Every structure is written in structure tokens, then in C-alpha cells.
Swiss-Prot record:
Source superkingdom: Eukaryota
GO MF entries: rRNA binding; structural constituent of ribosome
SUPFAM superfamilies according to UniProt: Prokaryotic type KH domain (KH-domain type II), Ribosomal protein S3 C-terminal domain
Gene name as annotated: rps3
GO biological process, one term: translation
Record's protein name: Small ribosomal subunit protein uS3c
HAMAP family: Ribosomal_uS3_B (MF_01309_B)
GO cellular component terms attached to this protein's record: chloroplast; cytosolic small ribosomal subunit
Amino acid sequence: MGQKINPLGFRLGTTQSHHSFWFAQPRNFSTGLQEDEKIRNSIKNYIQKNRRISSGFEGIARIRIKKRIDLIQVIIHIGFPNLLIEGRTRGIEELQINVQKEFHFSNRRLKIAITRVEKPYEQANILAEYIALQLKNRVSFRKAMKKAIELTEQTDTKGIQVQIAGRIDGKEIARVEWIREGRVPLQTIRAKIDHCSYTIRTIYGVLGIKIWIFVD
């Protein structure tokens, strides 16, 4: 059987960069890692609660974290900044205060910035979220997959593969369904590929969505 490596980890240092950038002593590494995860979850929860439109759609492509001795810098790459609460500057300030309260950063400053993603549907995370929303609204899985591919094709990507696994359409036996358009060269390290694994809870159980996008 073929062993499937994570396409992002496989390309670190060539076409991919780390989403967290900091140094720590080996004994403190796990604490720093858990802190990163908590910061990301806190930001996602805040955006979910304070969206203008209650669509269940976050539109976050990725959250990058850079740490120094006295500063934690968080950059949120978001596809649809308009979904955030009114007054972008006020929204960022509120988010910053909210995260700072939760973690009690005594000797470190927290700085949050928001960057708009040029082509949202070129991002695997945003696309997976879109498919998940369609499946929650009882849209046929094939229709959701085809619509996602149509949205990606508008962004000049070279190829896309979408896979859904689980009790699709409420069938008793779990199965895997996938669709591919264009080229997705997983073995070529030079190929810039965006990948995402996304879990969604439906009334029938848990479904897993995987997306591979050949960007360049």
C-alpha cells in the first residue's frame, strides 16, 4: 500500500513555510505549542461569535504566529474580512483585548494583524469550510464537490482533488468518494500544493473532507 505523507510537511523549506515561528528550550517546547493551539482556537471562536452574517463561515486561510521575548505577533490571513464585526480597526482591538484577557500575557505584548487573501477559493481551508457548510445544509455531496471545483477553476489554479469520507448521504456503510480536475503532482516537491483535512459533524455522523490544490 502507498504511504501518504502530508503534502505541506513534505514541502517545508521549498514551497511551504512554517505557520509558527519561534525558538524555545526543549523542556518548554510543548508549552509553546499548546499556547499556539489555544491562541488559534480563541481567535476562531471569537470570529465565529462576532461575525456580521451568521453563516457558519469563518473564511480563515491560516493563522501565523511569531514569538519574541517581549512580543507575540499574530497574522490572520482571512478570505472575507467583511464577515468580521463592523469597524475593522475596532474589531481587531476587541479581538486583541479578548485574547489577551484569556491568556494573561504579563510580560509579553500581543499584536494582531489581519491580511486579506487575494483569491479566497485558492485556499484549501476556505474551500473545505465551504463544502462543510453545503453538506450541513443537506446539499448533495457531488453537487458540493462540483461547485467547489468550479469556484477554484475561477482562480487560475492548475488542478484540484477533493475527497469526502464517512457515512455519505446517511448510508449505513461508510465509503470514500473523490473527484479530481487538472493535475495534482503530489510527488513533485517543487509543485506548490495547498492541502487541508477538515472534520464535519452531521446528523449521520462524522465526515472527513480532504482537499489538495495545485497552485503553481
